[in-house]
C-alpha cells in the first residue's frame, strides 16, 4: 500500500466527524415540512421525535431552550413546519435534525410567506421612517376602511363619539377576510384618496387567526397603503397581532379602539385646557389692570401735588407763618421796650429828676411811636409783597387764564391744539372752559392768508 493511500484511510470516528462537519457546513439551516411520530419528552425537558413523510423519516431533537418558545404542544400525526440544522450523532453514526423552531404546517407556510414578503418590502424601503406621514392635529374628518358589520367599526365609532362627538366620520365598507378582501381594501384606499374627503384613514379589523388576518399581509394592500396621500393608521387584530400593513402604515395602533383614540381629540380634556387658559388670562388681566390702576393713582397724586391751587395754598400758608412770626417778633420787642421803660421810670422816681424824667418820657414816647410806625410799615410791606405774590400766582394759573375768556382745545389724541396742521375736517375736539368742557366736531378747515395758517371751524 502506497503512502498516499495510507493517508486516506479513515477510522470510524474520523469518518463520522468528517461527515458531521460536512453536513453542518454545507447544509446549514433548512425549513422542513413533515409529520410527527414517536414524540417523547424525558425529565430533561428536551423533545425527541421522528419527522416523516410517506416514503422516508429522520430523527429530530428540540432542546429545552428552543421548545420553550413554541406556542403549542406537538402531537403524533400532526403536520408541522420545522426550521432545523442538520448534524450527525457520531457515536452511532446516525444523522439527525436539531430543531430551532416549530409551527403547525398551515400557519408555518403562511409565516414563511409573511417573512419573505416582509424582507422584500423592507429591502424596497416601504418600511422606512422617512416615508411616514404625520397625522393631522386635530383631524377634521376621519375615514374608516373596515367591514360594515364587524366589531371593529362599532369600537371605532364608540370611541370617537365618546371623545369627539363633533368629528365627522366617513365609512368605506369593505370585506376584510376572504379571497376578494385584499382587492376590495385596495379599492377602498384608492377611493378615499380620489375623493379626498378625509385627512386621516383608519384601516383595520378585529382579531382572528393568522388566516383571518391574511388580507392585511397581501402585497397589494401594502403598496396601496404606501402610495396613499392620506396618512393611514393600521388597526389590525389585537396588540399581539402584527401584519405587513402595520409596517407600511404611517402609524400602527394595537387595536381599532386605540386607533380611534390616536386620531381624535379628547373634548373633555380640551375644554379643561381652555378653561385653564381662560383662568390664566383672567388672572393676567386682573394683574394688568391692578398695575395700571396703581400707576394711574400715582400719576393722579403727582398731578394734584402740582396743581396751581395747591401750590398757591402752600405759598399762602408760608406767608401766614412769616406774618405770625413777624407780629410775634414786634410784640416781643414792644414788651421788652415797655419793661425797659418801666424800669427807667422806677429809677427816675427814686431820684425824682422831674425835668429829666419829662424829657426821657418824651423821648420814649417818640421812640415808641417811631417803632410802631416802623413795625406797621414793615407789616404793610409784607402784606403788599404777599398780595403781589398771590396776584402773580393767580396770573400764571391756567384757571385764571380760562376765567379771562380763554380756552384750551385738545385733539382726539389728547394733544394741545396749536396749529391747524394737527386736525382735519371730521375730527372731534375737546375744549376746556372755566366751568367745564365742550365737545365739538370740525366741519371745515380754512388757511388764513396773512399767517398762512388754517382756520378751524367747529360745531
Curated annotation (Swiss-Prot):
Source taxon at top rank:
Bacteria
Biological process terms from the Gene Ontology for this record are:
DNA catabolic process
Q: What is a single cellular component term in the Gene Ontology annotation?
A: cytoplasm
Task: Give the first-level EC class, as a single word.
Answer: hydrolase
Query: What does the record give as EC number?
Result: 3.1.11.6
As one GO molecular function, the record gives: nucleic acid binding
Q: Which UniProt keywords apply?
A: Cytoplasm, Exonuclease, Hydrolase, Nuclease
Catalyzed reactions per annotation: Exonucleolytic cleavage in either 5'- to 3'- or 3'- to 5'-direction to yield nucleoside 5'-phosphates
Chief location of this protein within or outside the cell: cytoplasm
> CDD domains recorded for this chain?
ExoVII_LU_OBF (cd04489)
Subcellular location(s): the record lists: Cytoplasm
Cross-referenced InterPro entries, in alphabetical order? Exonuc_VII_L, Exonuc_VII_lsu_C, OB-fold_nuc-bd_dom
Report the family membership.
Answer: Belongs to the XseA family.
Q: What does this protein do?
A: Bidirectionally degrades single-stranded DNA into large acid-insoluble oligonucleotides, which are then degraded further into small acid-soluble oligonucleotides.
The record, for PANTHER family, names: EXODEOXYRIBONUCLEASE 7 LARGE SUBUNIT
Quaternary structure?
Heterooligomer composed of large and small subunits.
Q: What is this protein called?
A: Exodeoxyribonuclease 7 large subunit
Q: State the species of origin.
A: Yersinia pestis
